[in-house]
């Protein structure tokens, strides 16, 4: 699939993608310690995520201008090191407003400066027929890195007493890891050593100057962006499976952190290759795969609402939530792959990734706060059923958009073949 040199670069990009989000995603392994030692409610944790996402959304729009221009070596290494330094500040246990400030800056360092450039770098490693597998293995690699690093941080937390000192030690561990990766990126990554492999239409110099305008006018890219939007709106709800199992199923606190890691990271290792292989090898279309899985997600969420959770065994509840999460992670693995499937011009790929991220990750601006406040205002199982219902509506909307995208890509390919004839 890839040469040894490209596999080495792929591994480096995976290491970057698997470490930079450990601090912004601190809640995944340390949700309960965050509530206890940062003194935060469900809604306030949701607010921190929403502030982060607001800055991220604005940042993604701004990154449309530079994602194809600035050297990756500098933007990626700086973003990693800056993220680590913000983590060091978190160990001072800032107040609520300090938490909001740090999570806002995470939106700049992790998302605006790093993510679109990282996605473009991954996409350029393979041709248009390899995009599903490429992004699938990328998510798998991130899942492996995520899991190893997160469980290591949890071990550090336990080693230092599972209290305030352990929480600080866990944050220090995350911070030092991401700074180290930033230094490696700076000395190893070479912007000139990689040539784009995606078989796409080339454009002349005049077109390059208007790539942003042409991206904004491309209906296919907008449909891809909204596909990502609805996947991510459902994905945001996975975070609240953690308090769901603790409050409804009375999951022991010792297992809450481990479940959070499995829910957010281990599922990437399962979902990544499954989503990539099915979309490329069986359906031969990432957009069709997203369509089918949106339909399955809608049905699964309706079933989740109807189940008698209060009388079910805890391990059955864990199996149900993890099973649904696996479906969502197969979608996350390939939701940018339609950009390669649609053969978007190479000089527009970075801008297309930025626009897709700008629209696609927008749910995090409001979903975390929305879900958190619903749970705070509706204690018990009823709050979770409301959240699951909203997630089902997002999944159904995603199915509708996916049908439109499949038709659009098919039409686009026919037009390109006609133009070449």
From Swiss-Prot:
Top-level taxon: Bacteria
InterPro entries from the UniProt entry: MFS, MFS_dom, MFS_trans_sf, OPA_Antiporter
Principal subcellular localization: membrane
One annotated Gene Ontology cellular component of this protein: plasma membrane
Periplasmic topological segments: 1-44, 92-95, 168, 376-385
Induction line: Down-regulated by cystine.
Topology in the lipid bilayer: Multi-pass membrane protein
Matching Pfam families: MFS_1
Keywords per UniProt: Cell inner membrane, Cell membrane, Membrane, Transmembrane, Transmembrane helix, Transport
Subcellular location: Cell inner membrane
Transmembrane segments: 45-65, 74-91, 96-118, 147-167, 169-189, 221-241, 242-262, 289-309, 310-330, 355-375, 386-406
Topology, Cytoplasmic side: 66-73, 119-146, 190-220, 263-288, 331-354, 407-421
Family: Belongs to the major facilitator superfamily.
This protein's name: Inner membrane protein YihN
Lineage: Bacteria, Pseudomonadati, Pseudomonadota, Gammaproteobacteria, Enterobacterales
């Amino acid at each position: 699939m890839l040469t040894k040199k490209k596999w080495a670069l792929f591994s480096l990009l995976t290491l970057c993608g698997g470490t930079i989000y450990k601090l912004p995603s601190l809640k995944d392994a340390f949700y309960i310690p965050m509530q206890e030692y940062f003194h935060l409610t469900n809604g306030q944790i949701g607010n921190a995520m929403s502030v982060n996402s607001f800055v991220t959304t604005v940042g993604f729009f701004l990154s449309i201008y530079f994602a194809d221009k600035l050297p990756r070596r500098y933007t990626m290494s700086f973003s990693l090191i800056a993220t680590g330094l913000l983590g060091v500040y978190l160990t001072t246990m800032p107040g609520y407003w300090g938490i909001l400030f740090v999570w806002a800056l995470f939106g700049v360092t992790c998302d605006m400066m790093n993510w679109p450039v990282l996605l473009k770098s991954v996409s350029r490693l393979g041709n248009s027929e390899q995009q599903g597998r490429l992004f699938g293995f990328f998510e798998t690699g991130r899942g492996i890195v995520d899991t190893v690093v997160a469980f290591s941080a949890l071990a550090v937390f336990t080693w230092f007493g599972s209290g305030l000192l352990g929480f600080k030690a866990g944050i220090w561990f995350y911070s030092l890891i991401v700074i180290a990766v930033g230094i490696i990126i700076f000395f190893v990554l070479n912007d000139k050593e990689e040539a784009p492999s995606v078989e796409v239409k080339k454009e002349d110099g005049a077109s390059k100057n208007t790539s942003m305008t042409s991206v904004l006018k491309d209906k296919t890219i907008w449909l891809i962006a909204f596909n990502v939007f609805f996947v991510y709106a459902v994905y945001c709800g996975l975070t609240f499976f953690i308090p769901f199992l603790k409050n409804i199923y009375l999951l022991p606190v010792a297992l809450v952190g481990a479940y959070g890691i499995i829910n957010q990271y281990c599922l990437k290792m399962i979902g990544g290759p499954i989503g990539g292989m099915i979309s490329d090898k069986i359906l031969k279309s990432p957009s069709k795969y997203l369509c089918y899985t949106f339909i399955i997600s809608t049905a699964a969420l309706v079933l989740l609402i109807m189940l008698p959770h209060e009388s079910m065994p805890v391990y059955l509840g864990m199996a149900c939530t993890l099973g649904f999460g696996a479906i969502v992670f197969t979608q996350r693995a390939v939701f940018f792959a339609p950009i390669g499937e649609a053969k978007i011009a190479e000089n527009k790929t970075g801008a297309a990734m930025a626009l897709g991220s700008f629209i696609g990750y927008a749910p995090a601006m409001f979903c975390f706060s929305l879900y958190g406040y619903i749970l705070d205002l509706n204690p018990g199982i009823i709050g979770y059923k409301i959240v699951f219902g909203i997630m089902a509506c997002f999944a159904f909307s995603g199915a509708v958009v996916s049908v439109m995208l499949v038709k659009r890509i098919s039409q686009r390919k026919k037009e390109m073949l006609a133009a070449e004839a």
